[in-house]
């Protein structure tokens, strides 16, 4: 999987938007993928476990709404 700051941000956003309870470690492992899939399902997106452009845009909106 991917790793780094982008993944850390995504993990933080998934935690806030979904209550995912992920460890923010910057590693896109199985738990992060599962949380991504759950978020995609909730948002009615294609479920692929990958944070592409559309998923990212929805995640940012959901994060901001949860603030």
Residue spans of the language-model regions?
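C-terminal extensions
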Residues: 65-67
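Short acidic, glycine/serine/threonine-rich helix-capping segments at coil-helix boundaries
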Residues: 1-61
